[in-house]
Design a protein with these regions (language model features):
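Nucleotidyltransferase catalytic core that binds NTPs
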Residues: 1-154
């Protein structure tokens, strides 16, 4: 007999993490059994033109410590998207066989967006459509911004 589990995937730079990110994670976890967070790597941060506030290792450690988060994946992508990371997670979660396949677990994947990202404009839309990853907007409003916080420290 097959079981279904919902896996929400959120992504971002989290440089630094703030209360808007926390709300995104908490709201995503309300609709999912598992929450995986893709943390954009330092190369992506440089491509974005953002100054380092925290290294990728620090950001991953902080995100992993949050109660709502079940797992963290440091982005494998070389551009500013998380397309390849989404493909990797799709392969990991599309179907996990346990006990000889009799008790398989199927996963419904959700790519969740916060207050300033929308499924009709995100660069990952094509991958989500191709792989059957559902996109959900509005998982937390634009409460705060890492850019705002960093500009206030100047």
């Amino acid at each position: 007999m097959s079981k279904k589990r919902v896996v929400a995937i959120a992504s971002g730079y989290f440089n630094p993490v703030h209360k808007g990110h926390i709300e995104l994670f908490e709201r995503a976890k309300e609709v999912a059994d598992v929450l995986i967070v893709i943390v954009n790597n330092d190369k992506q941060r440089e491509l974005k033109g953002s100054k380092e506030f925290q290294s990728e290792a620090e950001r991953c450690k902080i995100i992993q410590s949050l109660k709502a988060v079940d797992g963290v994946l440091l982005s494998v992508d070389e551009d500013r998207t998380v397309r390849e990371s989404l493909k990797l997670l799709y392969e990991r979660y599309k179907k996990i066989e346990m006990m000889g396949g009799e008790h398989s677990v199927e996963h419904k994947l959700l790519f969740v967006n916060g207050g300033d990202q929308f499924s009709n404009t995100v660069a990952e839309r094509d991958v989500c459509m191709e792989y059957g990853i559902y996109m959900i907007d509005g998982m937390g409003g634009k409460i705060q911004s890492s850019s705002w916080l960093l500009s206030e420290t100047k």
